[in-house]
Protein backbone atom coordinates (compact mmCIF):
# COMPACT_ATOMS: atom_id res chain seq x y z
CA UNK A 1 0.00 0.00 0.00
CA UNK A 2 1.32 3.45 -0.80
CA UNK A 3 1.22 6.84 0.86
CA UNK A 4 0.77 10.03 -1.16
CA UNK A 5 -1.35 13.16 -0.77
CA UNK A 6 -2.70 15.44 -3.49
CA UNK A 7 -4.62 18.68 -3.76
CA UNK A 8 -8.40 18.54 -3.60
CA UNK A 9 -8.73 19.71 -7.23
CA UNK A 10 -7.10 16.56 -8.59
CA UNK A 11 -8.74 13.93 -6.40
CA UNK A 12 -10.48 10.99 -8.03
CA UNK A 13 -13.41 9.11 -6.51
CA UNK A 14 -14.21 5.40 -6.55
CA UNK A 15 -17.64 4.03 -7.57
CA UNK A 16 -18.29 3.46 -3.84
CA UNK A 17 -17.57 7.09 -2.90
CA UNK A 18 -21.23 8.05 -2.54
CA UNK A 19 -21.84 5.15 -0.13
CA UNK A 20 -19.17 6.60 2.14
CA UNK A 21 -20.83 10.00 1.98
CA UNK A 22 -24.19 8.43 2.88
CA UNK A 23 -22.57 6.82 5.93
CA UNK A 24 -21.05 10.19 6.90
CA UNK A 25 -17.50 8.95 6.51
CA UNK A 26 -14.70 11.38 7.26
CA UNK A 27 -12.77 11.80 4.01
CA UNK A 28 -9.11 12.40 3.19
CA UNK A 29 -6.82 12.58 0.17
CA UNK A 30 -4.70 9.49 -0.49
CA UNK A 31 -2.70 8.57 -3.57
CA UNK A 32 -4.69 10.95 -5.75
CA UNK A 33 -8.06 9.78 -4.42
CA UNK A 34 -10.67 11.14 -2.01
CA UNK A 35 -11.12 8.23 0.37
CA UNK A 36 -12.81 7.50 3.73
CA UNK A 37 -10.32 7.73 6.59
CA UNK A 38 -12.92 6.57 9.11
CA UNK A 39 -16.62 5.81 9.47
CA UNK A 40 -17.60 5.02 13.08
CA UNK A 41 -14.10 5.56 14.51
CA UNK A 42 -10.67 4.05 13.93
CA UNK A 43 -10.60 2.00 17.14
CA UNK A 44 -14.09 0.54 16.60
CA UNK A 45 -13.26 -0.33 13.00
CA UNK A 46 -9.90 -1.84 13.99
CA UNK A 47 -11.50 -4.00 16.66
CA UNK A 48 -14.24 -5.13 14.26
CA UNK A 49 -11.60 -6.57 11.93
CA UNK A 50 -9.66 -8.22 14.74
CA UNK A 51 -12.77 -9.76 16.34
CA UNK A 52 -15.42 -10.14 13.62
CA UNK A 53 -15.32 -8.51 10.18
CA UNK A 54 -14.81 -5.16 8.54
CA UNK A 55 -14.89 -4.06 4.91
CA UNK A 56 -12.79 -1.57 2.99
CA UNK A 57 -13.22 0.16 -0.35
CA UNK A 58 -9.84 -0.41 -2.03
CA UNK A 59 -11.03 0.35 -5.55
CA UNK A 60 -8.38 3.07 -5.80
CA UNK A 61 -5.66 0.44 -6.18
CA UNK A 62 -4.21 -0.27 -9.63
CA UNK A 63 -5.47 -3.38 -11.45
CA UNK A 64 -3.79 -4.87 -14.52
CA UNK A 65 -4.63 -7.93 -16.60
CA UNK A 66 -1.92 -9.55 -18.72
CA UNK A 67 -1.96 -12.42 -21.16
CA UNK A 68 0.48 -13.89 -23.62
CA UNK A 69 2.83 -16.73 -24.35
CA UNK A 70 5.85 -16.83 -22.02
CA UNK A 71 4.14 -14.23 -19.81
CA UNK A 72 5.48 -15.65 -16.55
CA UNK A 73 9.03 -15.92 -17.87
CA UNK A 74 8.86 -12.24 -18.89
CA UNK A 75 7.51 -11.18 -15.48
CA UNK A 76 10.33 -13.19 -13.88
CA UNK A 77 12.77 -10.52 -15.04
CA UNK A 78 10.93 -7.79 -13.12
CA UNK A 79 10.73 -9.34 -9.65
CA UNK A 80 13.07 -11.22 -7.27
CA UNK A 81 10.47 -13.89 -6.46
CA UNK A 82 10.26 -17.15 -8.41
CA UNK A 83 6.92 -16.88 -10.19
CA UNK A 84 7.48 -20.20 -11.98
CA UNK A 85 6.44 -21.92 -8.75
CA UNK A 86 2.91 -20.56 -9.03
CA UNK A 87 0.12 -22.95 -9.94
CA UNK A 88 -3.13 -21.66 -11.49
CA UNK A 89 -5.18 -20.16 -8.67
CA UNK A 90 -2.13 -19.11 -6.63
CA UNK A 91 -0.69 -15.64 -6.03
CA UNK A 92 2.66 -14.18 -4.99
CA UNK A 93 3.28 -11.02 -3.00
CA UNK A 94 6.46 -9.51 -4.44
CA UNK A 95 8.22 -6.27 -5.42
CA UNK A 96 9.18 -4.52 -8.63
CA UNK A 97 12.87 -3.56 -8.46
CA UNK A 98 14.99 -0.89 -10.14
CA UNK A 99 18.59 -1.61 -11.24
CA UNK A 100 19.86 -0.44 -7.84
CA UNK A 101 17.72 -3.05 -6.09
CA UNK A 102 15.34 -0.37 -4.80
CA UNK A 103 11.63 -1.09 -4.57
CA UNK A 104 9.54 0.54 -7.29
CA UNK A 105 6.39 -0.87 -5.67
CA UNK A 106 5.09 -3.87 -3.77
CA UNK A 107 2.54 -5.83 -5.78
CA UNK A 108 0.59 -9.08 -5.90
CA UNK A 109 0.76 -11.30 -8.99
CA UNK A 110 -2.23 -13.65 -9.38
CA UNK A 111 -1.52 -16.48 -11.84
CA UNK A 112 -4.69 -17.59 -13.59
CA UNK A 113 -3.25 -20.35 -15.75
CA UNK A 114 -2.49 -21.31 -19.34
CA UNK A 115 -4.95 -22.20 -22.09
CA UNK A 116 -4.57 -24.91 -24.73
CA UNK A 117 -2.75 -22.49 -27.06
CA UNK A 118 -0.02 -21.85 -24.49
CA UNK A 119 -1.31 -18.37 -23.62
CA UNK A 120 -0.76 -17.55 -19.94
CA UNK A 121 -2.95 -15.16 -17.96
CA UNK A 122 -2.19 -13.13 -14.84
CA UNK A 123 -3.75 -10.34 -12.81
CA UNK A 124 -1.64 -7.79 -10.92
CA UNK A 125 -2.69 -5.40 -8.15
CA UNK A 126 -0.47 -2.38 -7.44
CA UNK A 127 -0.64 0.64 -5.17
CA UNK A 128 -2.89 3.56 -6.07
CA UNK A 129 -0.22 6.26 -5.96
CA UNK A 130 2.16 4.26 -8.13
CA UNK A 131 -0.27 2.90 -10.72
CA UNK A 132 0.97 5.08 -13.59
CA UNK A 133 4.63 4.54 -12.68
CA UNK A 134 4.17 0.78 -12.40
CA UNK A 135 2.25 0.58 -15.67
CA UNK A 136 4.99 2.43 -17.55
CA UNK A 137 7.73 0.32 -15.95
CA UNK A 138 6.05 -3.01 -16.68
CA UNK A 139 5.20 -2.07 -20.27
CA UNK A 140 8.76 -0.89 -20.94
CA UNK A 141 10.13 -4.30 -19.92
CA UNK A 142 7.63 -6.62 -21.61
CA UNK A 143 7.59 -7.71 -25.24
CA UNK A 144 4.33 -6.07 -26.26
CA UNK A 145 4.27 -8.16 -29.42
CA UNK A 146 3.80 -11.20 -27.20
CA UNK A 147 1.94 -9.82 -24.18
CA UNK A 148 -1.42 -8.06 -24.05
CA UNK A 149 -1.60 -5.59 -21.15
CA UNK A 150 -4.82 -3.96 -20.00
CA UNK A 151 -5.26 -1.41 -17.22
CA UNK A 152 -8.71 -2.15 -15.80
CA UNK A 153 -8.30 0.13 -12.77
CA UNK A 154 -11.21 2.51 -13.53
CA UNK A 155 -13.54 -0.25 -14.68
CA UNK A 156 -13.65 -2.40 -11.55
CA UNK A 157 -14.52 -2.13 -7.86
CA UNK A 158 -12.29 -3.83 -5.31
CA UNK A 159 -13.68 -4.56 -1.84
CA UNK A 160 -11.72 -6.13 1.00
CA UNK A 161 -13.61 -7.96 3.74
CA UNK A 162 -11.28 -8.86 6.59
CA UNK A 163 -11.54 -10.59 9.94
CA UNK A 164 -12.14 -14.01 11.51
CA UNK A 165 -15.82 -13.93 10.54
CA UNK A 166 -15.26 -12.56 7.02
CA UNK A 167 -15.96 -15.85 5.26
CA UNK A 168 -19.30 -16.28 7.01
CA UNK A 169 -20.46 -12.82 5.97
CA UNK A 170 -19.26 -13.10 2.36
CA UNK A 171 -20.31 -16.68 1.54
CA UNK A 172 -24.08 -16.04 1.15
CA UNK A 173 -23.37 -13.68 -1.75
CA UNK A 174 -20.97 -15.99 -3.62
CA UNK A 175 -22.01 -19.09 -5.57
CA UNK A 176 -18.71 -20.97 -5.10
CA UNK A 177 -17.58 -22.48 -1.79
CA UNK A 178 -14.97 -20.14 -0.28
CA UNK A 179 -13.73 -22.53 2.40
CA UNK A 180 -11.25 -24.50 0.21
CA UNK A 181 -9.44 -21.34 -0.91
CA UNK A 182 -6.07 -21.18 0.82
CA UNK A 183 -4.17 -18.01 1.75
CA UNK A 184 -3.13 -16.25 -1.47
CA UNK A 185 -5.47 -18.51 -3.42
CA UNK A 186 -7.99 -17.06 -5.86
CA UNK A 187 -10.73 -18.02 -8.29
CA UNK A 188 -13.20 -16.72 -10.83
CA UNK A 189 -16.45 -16.50 -8.90
CA UNK A 190 -20.11 -15.63 -9.25
CA UNK A 191 -20.90 -12.73 -6.92
CA UNK A 192 -24.56 -11.75 -6.56
CA UNK A 193 -25.19 -13.63 -9.79
CA UNK A 194 -22.52 -11.75 -11.74
CA UNK A 195 -18.95 -12.60 -12.80
CA UNK A 196 -16.25 -11.66 -10.32
CA UNK A 197 -12.82 -12.52 -8.98
CA UNK A 198 -12.09 -13.41 -5.34
CA UNK A 199 -8.72 -13.80 -3.61
CA UNK A 200 -7.91 -14.81 -0.05
CA UNK A 201 -5.59 -11.87 0.47
CA UNK A 202 -5.54 -8.71 2.55
CA UNK A 203 -3.57 -6.01 4.33
CA UNK A 204 -4.65 -6.44 7.94
CA UNK A 205 -2.97 -9.55 9.32
CA UNK A 206 -6.33 -11.31 9.52
CA UNK A 207 -8.07 -13.86 7.33
CA UNK A 208 -10.14 -12.28 4.62
CA UNK A 209 -10.95 -11.81 0.97
CA UNK A 210 -10.58 -9.21 -1.74
CA UNK A 211 -13.39 -9.14 -4.31
CA UNK A 212 -13.10 -7.66 -7.80
CA UNK A 213 -16.41 -6.92 -9.54
CA UNK A 214 -18.11 -4.47 -11.88
CA UNK A 215 -19.11 -1.16 -10.22
CA UNK A 216 -22.85 -1.86 -9.99
CA UNK A 217 -22.17 -5.26 -8.41
CA UNK A 218 -19.71 -3.63 -6.01
CA UNK A 219 -22.32 -1.15 -4.84
CA UNK A 220 -24.85 -3.94 -4.28
CA UNK A 221 -22.27 -6.12 -2.48
CA UNK A 222 -21.24 -3.26 -0.18
CA UNK A 223 -24.87 -2.57 0.73
CA UNK A 224 -25.55 -6.28 1.26
CA UNK A 225 -22.54 -6.75 3.54
CA UNK A 226 -23.45 -3.59 5.46
CA UNK A 227 -27.03 -4.79 5.93
CA UNK A 228 -25.64 -8.14 7.16
CA UNK A 229 -23.67 -6.35 9.87
CA UNK A 230 -20.18 -5.88 8.42
CA UNK A 231 -18.53 -2.71 9.75
CA UNK A 232 -17.32 -0.24 7.08
CA UNK A 233 -13.68 0.72 7.67
CA UNK A 234 -11.49 3.52 6.42
CA UNK A 235 -7.82 4.13 5.78
CA UNK A 236 -7.16 4.93 9.44
CA UNK A 237 -7.99 1.42 10.64
CA UNK A 238 -6.33 -0.06 7.56
CA UNK A 239 -3.11 1.64 8.67
CA UNK A 240 -3.23 0.56 12.33
CA UNK A 241 -4.13 -2.99 11.31
CA UNK A 242 -1.31 -3.33 8.78
CA UNK A 243 1.19 -1.75 11.17
CA UNK A 244 0.37 -4.21 13.96
CA UNK A 245 1.01 -6.95 11.39
CA UNK A 246 4.26 -5.15 10.36
CA UNK A 247 3.14 -4.93 6.74
CA UNK A 248 5.09 -2.34 4.76
CA UNK A 249 3.51 0.88 3.50
CA UNK A 250 4.98 1.97 0.20
CA UNK A 251 6.31 5.53 0.35
CA UNK A 252 7.07 5.25 4.07
CA UNK A 253 8.57 1.88 5.04
CA UNK A 254 9.78 0.96 1.55
CA UNK A 255 10.61 3.02 -1.53
CA UNK A 256 12.96 3.34 -4.50
CA UNK A 257 15.93 3.62 -2.14
CA UNK A 258 15.25 0.58 0.05
CA UNK A 259 16.02 -2.98 -1.02
CA UNK A 260 13.94 -5.99 0.03
CA UNK A 261 16.87 -7.31 2.08
CA UNK A 262 17.05 -4.05 4.05
CA UNK A 263 13.27 -3.98 4.50
CA UNK A 264 12.93 -7.45 6.02
CA UNK A 265 11.50 -8.82 2.78
CA UNK A 266 14.31 -11.27 2.12
CA UNK A 267 11.74 -14.08 1.93
CA UNK A 268 10.66 -12.60 -1.41
CA UNK A 269 14.16 -12.97 -2.88
CA UNK A 270 14.74 -16.35 -4.51
CA UNK A 271 18.31 -16.07 -5.80
CA UNK A 272 18.88 -19.83 -5.87
CA UNK A 273 15.87 -20.89 -7.92
CA UNK A 274 15.56 -18.34 -10.72
CA UNK A 275 17.64 -16.58 -13.36
CA UNK A 276 18.46 -12.95 -13.88
CA UNK A 277 16.14 -10.12 -12.87
CA UNK A 278 16.46 -6.35 -12.56
CA UNK A 279 18.47 -5.52 -9.42
CA UNK A 280 19.80 -9.05 -8.94
CA UNK A 281 23.49 -8.08 -8.80
CA UNK A 282 22.84 -5.59 -5.99
CA UNK A 283 20.91 -8.15 -3.95
CA UNK A 284 23.62 -10.76 -4.52
CA UNK A 285 26.18 -8.29 -3.19
CA UNK A 286 24.04 -7.44 -0.16
CA UNK A 287 23.45 -11.12 0.53
CA UNK A 288 27.19 -11.80 0.40
CA UNK A 289 28.38 -8.85 2.50
CA UNK A 290 25.29 -8.09 4.59
CA UNK A 291 23.14 -4.96 4.54
CA UNK A 292 24.21 -1.78 6.29
CA UNK A 293 20.76 -1.03 7.71
CA UNK A 294 17.62 -2.93 8.56
CA UNK A 295 13.95 -2.21 9.13
CA UNK A 296 13.17 -3.06 12.75
CA UNK A 297 10.21 -3.19 15.09
CA UNK A 298 10.29 -0.73 17.98
CA UNK A 299 8.32 -0.45 21.19
CA UNK A 300 8.50 2.89 22.97
CA UNK A 301 8.04 3.47 26.68
CA UNK A 302 4.63 4.37 28.10
CA UNK A 303 2.23 5.89 25.60
CA UNK A 304 4.78 8.01 23.72
CA UNK A 305 4.17 7.36 20.03
CA UNK A 306 7.09 7.34 17.60
CA UNK A 307 5.73 8.86 14.39
CA UNK A 308 6.95 8.85 10.80
CA UNK A 309 10.07 10.99 10.46
CA UNK A 310 11.08 10.94 14.14
CA UNK A 311 14.77 10.33 14.82
CA UNK A 312 16.10 7.15 16.41
CA UNK A 313 19.03 7.60 18.80
CA UNK A 314 21.71 5.39 20.32
CA UNK A 315 23.86 6.80 23.10
CA UNK A 316 22.48 10.23 22.27
CA UNK A 317 23.47 10.10 18.61
CA UNK A 318 21.08 9.93 15.66
CA UNK A 319 21.36 6.49 14.07
CA UNK A 320 18.13 6.13 12.10
CA UNK A 321 14.56 7.20 11.54
CA UNK A 322 11.02 6.03 12.19
CA UNK A 323 9.01 5.14 9.09
CA UNK A 324 5.63 4.28 10.68
CA UNK A 325 4.26 4.39 14.22
CA UNK A 326 1.01 4.21 16.14
CA UNK A 327 -0.57 3.35 19.47
CA UNK A 328 -1.59 -0.25 18.86
CA UNK A 329 -5.33 -0.63 19.57
CA UNK A 330 -4.92 -4.39 20.05
CA UNK A 331 -1.80 -4.38 22.21
CA UNK A 332 -2.39 -1.14 24.08
CA UNK A 333 1.13 0.26 23.65
CA UNK A 334 3.03 2.19 20.97
CA UNK A 335 4.74 0.29 18.15
CA UNK A 336 6.82 1.56 15.26
CA UNK A 337 8.94 0.56 12.29
CA UNK A 338 12.33 2.20 11.79
CA UNK A 339 15.59 1.84 9.90
CA UNK A 340 18.77 1.53 11.98
CA UNK A 341 22.30 0.22 11.35
CA UNK A 342 22.35 -3.58 11.21
CA UNK A 343 24.54 -3.77 14.31
CA UNK A 344 21.70 -2.15 16.30
CA UNK A 345 18.90 -4.27 14.83
CA UNK A 346 19.01 -7.19 17.27
CA UNK A 347 15.86 -7.90 19.29
CA UNK A 348 16.30 -6.49 22.78
CA UNK A 349 18.62 -3.67 21.65
CA UNK A 350 17.91 -0.52 23.72
CA UNK A 351 17.46 2.67 21.69
CA UNK A 352 15.76 6.03 22.06
CA UNK A 353 13.30 7.99 19.94
CA UNK A 354 13.18 11.78 19.92
CA UNK A 355 9.56 12.80 20.46
CA UNK A 356 8.75 16.52 20.61
CA UNK A 357 12.35 17.39 21.40
CA UNK A 358 12.84 14.82 24.16
CA UNK A 359 14.50 11.39 23.97
CA UNK A 360 12.32 8.50 25.18
CA UNK A 361 13.51 4.92 25.77
CA UNK A 362 12.64 2.31 23.15
CA UNK A 363 13.59 -1.30 22.50
CA UNK A 364 13.89 -3.41 19.37
CA UNK A 365 11.14 -6.06 19.35
CA UNK A 366 10.16 -8.94 17.06
CA UNK A 367 7.93 -8.36 14.08
CA UNK A 368 5.06 -8.70 13.50
CA UNK A 369 3.87 -6.99 16.65
CA UNK A 370 0.61 -8.93 16.38
CA UNK A 371 -0.02 -12.33 14.82
CA UNK A 372 -3.58 -13.56 14.32
CA UNK A 373 -4.64 -17.02 15.42
CA UNK A 374 -7.54 -16.86 12.96
CA UNK A 375 -5.72 -16.82 9.61
CA UNK A 376 -7.23 -18.97 6.89
From Swiss-Prot:
Q: Which reaction does it catalyse?
A: N(6)-[(R)-S(8)-aminomethyldihydrolipoyl]-L-lysyl-[protein] + (6S)-5,6,7,8-tetrahydrofolate = N(6)-[(R)-dihydrolipoyl]-L-lysyl-[protein] + (6R)-5,10-methylene-5,6,7,8-tetrahydrofolate + NH4(+)
Q: Does the keyword Transferase apply?
A: yes
Q: Does the keyword Nucleotide-binding apply?
A: no
UniProt cross-references to SUPFAM superfamilies, sorted A to Z: Aminomethyltransferase beta-barrel domain, Folate-binding domain
In short, the EC number is 2.1.2.10
Q: Which UniProt keywords apply?
A: Aminotransferase, Transferase
Which GO biological-process labels does this protein carry? Answer: glycine decarboxylation via glycine cleavage system
A Pfam family the protein falls into: GCV_T
Q: Which InterPro entries does the entry link to?
A: GCS_T, GCS_T_bac, GCST_C, GCV_T_N, GcvT/YgfZ/DmdA, GcvT/YgfZ_C, TrmE/GcvT_dom1
Q: Name one GO cellular component term.
A: glycine cleavage complex
Enzyme class per UniProt:
transferase
User: Listed GO molecular functions?
Assistant: aminomethyltransferase activity; transaminase activity
Primary role: The glycine cleavage system catalyzes the degradation of glycine.
- What is the protein's quaternary organization? The glycine cleavage system is composed of four proteins: P, T, L and H.
Under the heading PANTHER family, the entry gives: AMINOMETHYLTRANSFERASE, AMINOMETHYLTRANSFERASE, MITOCHONDRIAL
Which family is this sequence assigned to?
Belongs to the GcvT family.
* Designated name of the protein: Aminomethyltransferase
Q: Which organism is it from?
A: Nostoc sp. (strain PCC 7120 / SAG 25.82 / UTEX 2576)
